[in-house]
């Protein structure tokens, strides 16, 4: 077997240029070929950026720094497992020719690339930008003394002129660099945005911080054209300041735009254009929408098979990058069980969940499966099922209908213990799992919920417990406060007419007690979707993702004050998986929140 590798443009190219690599392989043996692409800068070691896939094309946008890179491709015959490896050099040069910064347009009309001269090692740099009314800044990058400093500038209004300058920080002193200007472009026609309406404007008590709202909006399921709205960031007036153009495709209907990552990147689970199936890829993108790294369900399953684990059928709901550079991902698993399981009169297909810890090269390092650690006969209380065509379910491969047993919908890494907090929507439970930074047993350490290990104290509510909850997270960098969106399906099934709630729980893990610090009724019943977040000012943001679900569905972002009253409210004419309030597109929370 031999393999060749060709770039779309000749070297050298400037920082921020997209280079498309095409691999061409030949093999005298029959069999399907797939390809893995890796990149190395200097002698820092290769990092896999696109794991084995039948696609022989790799798009690479080196936006951080110039240097002498090595691009490596491995071609593999899936029948014989024979491989062929080729490594080629490619030079990336700085955009900065002298002592002045350079501001360049990108392929995204609302994102610029700011390039500053190298700065002394031990110092750091960030960029401020303003349109004269609204100001913000990038994250802070460390200087290395020899390479230019490059920043994506995002969170900008369309067709607007901004003034920018870098700030050099050395010890306790800061020095402003020269100013420059950049004018954003217009948003192209045809981009599918939801319509935003502000019900209650932001007031001083709820607009001092986190004045950006990042929304993962699905299309309206009543009048759907199977085309999702693009993930969109707006200000608190509903004006667009960023969007991800990569979702402008019917293939991504029902896919997940997961979460922002500190520094200005984003995690998502898009469809696979090779198969047409949704939720088949894990992808990290930069602010301009370029893919940084990617792997697939197919590649994950190749590794799970070698580990003796069940295959997965689709990524969903959540992912998180860990302090050690690993990434938690989750996916659905499917298994057929004999008659009698969960009360079935015939063999029954059951959907469970799998958590995987991927190392820096996106290789599976640790696996947790609900089928291994949970009681298969603890059936979900509302007898929910998935079909192969349900947009809120993964693709099914074993049967046309499956019991939707667990429906895990959030992951929350716990820095103090290295464990994971997970939400099982269809079980009305929250679990703490022994992860121990990738060497844990996987055992369930405790269960929080109506039938769990904790006693609810101090509440007169006839049904204080959450059900079918979303976005369960510890707050304040600790383990004593949990926020969540209580959809309330089980409670409302038994008490028609009630509504979803925003909840904040005080939890004592040593005494196994929990109390309600906040239990606020939402404007209606959202049977799915939703998020919860403590804001820097002490208020809480709740996203009721699917209100008025039977007629004219919409999502509503609500800021709740500590006394339970509503502040800022914004609605969009979509169903919204999650909503994040952010200081900037580079930072979700202020330190200590």
What do these predicted ranges mean?
Residues 29-36:
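Solvent-exposed loop segments of extracellular immunoglobulin-like
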Residues 48-55, 139-146:
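Short beta-strand segments within Ig-like beta-sandwich modules, predominantly Fibronectin type-III
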